[in-house]
């Protein structure tokens, strides 16, 4: 388990309040949460962060490679404490801008949604027919 973002967890708990984080996001901050990880990257790897425009979970990366869409399902987004509002089912934009400025955020979709078809480029790489949902 990656525990490098311990300081960032402490800072975000102090900034937003642990009870408020749980109320709004549904879970406490842990070393697995996206917010502290992005803050750690920004602080400790500024060159890498500066050359980053998007972040991906494994599922969203695969969907992007196959369809060209930058999306994340709501279930996965619920692991993005303190950046995802569970009740509103939306990114908490002010926190996203504060913790990870300059990054694009994936469009939120439901796990059952068809978000696109396999592209021609992905067909060449995978053998999956273009247009396959």
Question: Language-model segments: which ranges?
Answer:
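Gly/Ser/Thr-rich active-site cleft segment
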Residues: 22-133
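Active-site phosphate-binding/coordination module
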Residues: 1-35
